[in-house]
Amino acid sequence: MAEAARQELENQLRQTIETLVEISLLVHDTTGSQENKEGLIEQMDTLVKEFQRLKEIKCDKQIPIDVIDYIDQGRNPDVYTREFVELLLKQNQFIHGKMDIYTVSKGVRESTSDDIPLDISCGAHSNTEISTNPGQKRQGNVS
């Protein structure tokens, strides 16, 4: 079904381009006669109908503006796709690395939690000493 819709769209685009060429020929070779004016009006009406038909059969595909800019600059849109995929690959590798580090650190923390007990009261006491005497050096035994 998608291929048939694509083919219909291509055929309609070809017809529209042919109509535009005919209009340009009529405008270029205009003599100002009534027959020429009527022919031009008829071709313009045909063009409007063809644009309406294009609007009816258009594809509902979202095209990134960057791809359109690439095409406007005469560049190959496949280059944009390749660069975008490479960027996503780098980001994916970075996030995967972060996840690996988190998994390893979680495993290390779990394996050492039984061996190294946390002394919360010692840590809280040290923090109050530091905050109450900010100008003095901390004294005491470090265990």
UniProtKB/Swiss-Prot annotation:
UniProt function note: Component of the Mediator complex, a coactivator involved in the regulated transcription of nearly all RNA polymerase II-dependent genes. Mediator functions as a bridge to convey information from gene-specific regulatory proteins to the basal RNA polymerase II transcription machinery. Mediator is recruited to promoters by direct interactions with regulatory proteins and serves as a scaffold for the assembly of a functional preinitiation complex with RNA polymerase II and the general transcription factors.
Gene Ontology BP, a term: regulation of transcription by RNA polymerase II
Subcellular localization: Nucleus
This protein's record includes keyword Cell membrane: no
One GO location term (cellular component): mediator complex
Region (Disordered): 123-143
Similarity comment: Belongs to the Mediator complex subunit 10 family.
InterPro entries membership: Mediator_Med10
Chief localisation class: nucleus
GO molecular function (one): transcription coregulator activity
Keyword Transcription in annotation: yes
Keywords assigned by UniProt, alphabetized: Activator, Nucleus, Transcription, Transcription regulation
Polar residues composition-biased segments: 124-143
Subunit: Component of the Mediator complex.
Protein name: Mediator of RNA polymerase II transcription subunit 10
Annotated coiled-coil segments of the chain: none
